[in-house]
Design a protein with these regions (language model features):
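Non-catalytic extracellular/lumenal accessory regions of secreted precursors
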Residues: 1-7, 17, 37-40, 68-106, ...
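Beta-strand-connecting loops/turns
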Residues: 7-8, 52, 92, 104, ...
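A short beta-strand element within beta-rich, extracytoplasmic domains
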Residues: 9-16, 106-114, 222-231
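Short, surface-exposed beta-strand/strand-loop-strand elements in extracellular ectodomains
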Residues: 19-30, 119-131, 235-247
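Edge beta-strands of jelly-roll/beta-sandwich modules across compartments, strongly enriched
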Residues: 20, 58-73, 97, 119-121, ...
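Solvent-exposed serine/threonine-rich low-complexity stretches and specific carbohydrate-binding patches
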Residues: 31-40, 122, 135-145, 248-256
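Exposed aromatic-hydrophobic patches
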Residues: 43-48, 97-98, 147-153, 258-265
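Noncatalytic modules at the cell exterior or secretory-pathway interfaces
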Residues: 47-62, 152-167, 222, 263-278
């Protein structure tokens, strides 16, 4: 018998020496809540519980050793700390979750649904500007299923809050990660950063100036290509490739996880990549890489 002491998301799991079936029943011992705890999974989420709820774990008659693990996870949270995980039980209304950014950073939220309900969740960011909350970048919706739905922003120092609109009775897990991102950018072609390996950088909502990168082709026997991609909420980036002042190619990247490739001419020389935001509200990361083929 398991009796719940605190309200929240109830979790139960087992560690066993064999593969004997171990089900979980309701308080009346009639309805099976979890068919088998001992099927190789680390844990099972039974659902939202309140103080005093009861469950029964049915063990086999012959048993060597079984360890039963139980816990209740809070389904409400307010402020967030870096590299921490939180759970929320949706109310169908917007909830706000404050966090601080000390230095220019790449900020990421991985959102996963727990349980059977996997409806869309509304997401956006606000910044505290002189005591007033103002939206940063674009709003979006994610539909978290088995896998994480990632939302990424490029943010300058300040006080922020994550706004979530989770459907009523839907349980979500939110993992918050913040990584400092030093501002390494060249704003003139003559000072372009030499692209020798893969790089990534961010644009915050207030950063608008174009940035320059240089790619050198030293052999005509093999060709070189530049890969371009991004991770942002809405908006996107434009990449223009130049040689000797002439624009060779323009590529717009508006979808995440969509890598585009520009094959450079089979000709020695220096090529330049100019990066700009497609919209003033774009905030997030862009990625540049090169390879020889």
């Amino acid at each position: 018998k398991i009796k719940v002491a605190d309200p929240g998301l109830f979790m139960v799991g087992v560690v066993s020496n064999d593969e004997t079936k171990i089900p979980v029943y309701d308080a009346a011992k009639k309805r099976i809540i979890v068919n088998n705890l001992n099927d190789g999974g680390d844990k099972e989420y039974v659902g939202i519980v309140k103080t005093g709820d009861e469950f029964y774990v049915k063990l086999p008659e012959k048993i060597d050793k079984v360890i039963i693990l139980t816990g209740v996870i809070k389904t409400e949270f307010t402020s967030m700390a870096n590299q921490k995980s939180y759970y929320e039980l949706g109310k169908g209304t917007i909830t706000y979750h404050p966090f601080s950014v000390a230095k220019r950073s790449k900020v990421q939220f991985d959102i996963t649904s727990i349980g059977k309900k996997h409806e869309k969740v509304g997401v956006y960011i606000e910044k505290n500007v002189n005591g007033t909350w103002k939206k940063v970048g674009y709003s979006t919706t994610v539909k978290p299923d088995k896998y994480d739905s990632t939302v990424l922003y490029g943010l300058e120092a300040g006080k922020y809050r994550l706004a979530l609109k989770t459907p009523k009775d839907q349980i979500i897990n939110v993992e918050y990660t913040r990584d400092k991102s030093k501002k390494k950018a060249a704003y003139k072609k003559s000072k372009a950063i030499h692209l020798k390996s893969d790089i990534d950088s961010i644009y915050t909502s207030t950063e608008k100036a174009a940035r320059w990168y240089k790619v050198s082709v030293s052999s005509t026997k093999k060709r070189k290509a530049v890969t371009l991609s991004k991770d942002s909420v809405g908006g996107g980036f434009k990449f223009c490739v130049y040689q000797k002042g002439k624009r060779l190619k323009t590529v717009k990247v508006t979808k995440n996880d969509k890598v585009k490739t520009v094959k450079l001419p089979k000709k020695k020389g220096a090529y330049y990549v100019k990066v700009t935001k497609l919209t003033s509200k774009t905030t997030g990361a862009y990625y540049l890489g090169t390879y020889t083929y």
